[in-house]
């Protein structure tokens, strides 16, 4: 089996939290959110290397205030870009020989070992895979005037989570394409779809939340008790 690399994107600001520090550094039960995220990947036996992506102005803070407190097994810290896709591009360019790459939101601190292992398995089989859950609410499509125009079948909808998992050569090819053609994307599965490739969607977990709002933080505090 080839090498498996996880890329942890920790570039989120804490504006919606009303916090002075970036959301990945907000503490839950005495430990920053990024601690729980990194530990989840460190504890997976199939992960060979962890790359952490941080904004340029937060790398020194992490090295000074966070890293000395914990025994992280980070292979390297990469400077993020202006947009999420730029940060992923920078990380991919820092990887040498690699078979599978997992791209994960640093604020998703409660990803399970099963999701990580399933992502590796399915990306090896299909080339690209991502976890997801069925939306709990009915989803509506509205027009520019604000009126509902359609109600998609909820059974066919998936709220996609991370880690999004790929064969390295495939996602690298996709990122080169969107970089060269200046295409804006919202996640990495979209990049693979732009290549005309399919993404296998497997079962995620409602606990695998992205901690973004104060309400999410309350739920996160419950998870770590």
UniProtKB/Swiss-Prot annotation:
Pathway(s) this gene product operates in, as recorded in its UniProt entry: Isoprenoid biosynthesis; isopentenyl diphosphate biosynthesis via DXP pathway; isopentenyl diphosphate from 1-deoxy-D-xylulose 5-phosphate: step 2/6
EC number: 2.7.7.60
Superkingdom to which the source organism belongs: Bacteria
Keyword Metal-binding listed: no
Alphabetized SUPFAM superfamilies for the sequence: Nucleotide-diphospho-sugar transferases
Keywords, ordered alphabetically: Isoprene biosynthesis, Nucleotidyltransferase, Transferase
Pfam families according to UniProt: IspD
Keyword Nucleotidyltransferase in record: yes
InterPro entries noted in UniProt: IspD (IPR001228), IspD/TarI (IPR034683), IspD/TarI_cytidylyltransf_bact (IPR050088), ISPD_synthase_CS (IPR018294), Nucleotide-diphossugar_trans (IPR029044)
EC class of the enzyme, as a word: transferase
UniProt-annotated site: Transition state stabilizer, residues: 16, 23
GO process annotations (BP): isopentenyl diphosphate biosynthetic process, methylerythritol 4-phosphate pathway
Reaction(s) catalysed (UniProt annotation): 2-C-methyl-D-erythritol 4-phosphate + CTP + H(+) = 4-CDP-2-C-methyl-D-erythritol + diphosphate
Record-level Gene Ontology MF annotations: 2-C-methyl-D-erythritol 4-phosphate cytidylyltransferase activity
Site (Positions MEP for the nucleophilic attack): 154, 210
Job description of the protein: Catalyzes the formation of 4-diphosphocytidyl-2-C-methyl-D-erythritol from CTP and 2-C-methyl-D-erythritol 4-phosphate (MEP).
Entry similarity comment: Belongs to the IspD/TarI cytidylyltransferase family. IspD subfamily.
NCBIfam families in the cross-refs: ispD, PRK00155.1-3
Name listed for the protein in its UniProt record: 2-C-methyl-D-erythritol 4-phosphate cytidylyltransferase
Source organism: Clostridium perfringens (strain SM101 / Type A)
């Amino acid at each position: 089996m080839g090498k498996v690399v996880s890329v942890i994107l920790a570039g989120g600001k804490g504006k919606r939290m009303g916090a002075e520090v970036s959301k990945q550094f907000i503490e839950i039960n005495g430990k920053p959110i990024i601690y729980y995220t990194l530990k989840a990947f460190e504890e997976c036996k199939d992960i060979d290397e962890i790359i952490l992506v941080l904004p340029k102005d937060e790398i020194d803070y992490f090295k000074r205030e966070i890293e000395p407190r914990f025994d992280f097994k980070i292979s390297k810290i990469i400077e993020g870009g202006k947009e999420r896709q730029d940060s992923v591009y920078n990380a991919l360019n820092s990887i040498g020989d690699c078979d599978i790459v997992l791209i994960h939101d640093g604020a998703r601190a409660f990803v399970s070992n099963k999701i990580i292992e399933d992502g590796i398995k399915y990306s090896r089989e299909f080339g690209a895979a991502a976890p997801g859950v069925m939306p709990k609410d009915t989803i509506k499509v509205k027009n520019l005037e604000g009126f509902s125009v359609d109600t998609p079948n909820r059974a066919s909808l998936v709220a996609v989570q991370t880690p999004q998992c790929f064969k390295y050569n495939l996602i690298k090819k996709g990122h080169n394409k969107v970089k060269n053609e200046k295409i804006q994307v919202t996640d990495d599965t979209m990049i693979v779809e732009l290549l005309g490739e399919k993404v296998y969607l497997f079962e995620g977990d409602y606990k695998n939340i992205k901690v973004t709002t104060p309400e999410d933080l309350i739920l996160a505090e419950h998870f770590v008790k």
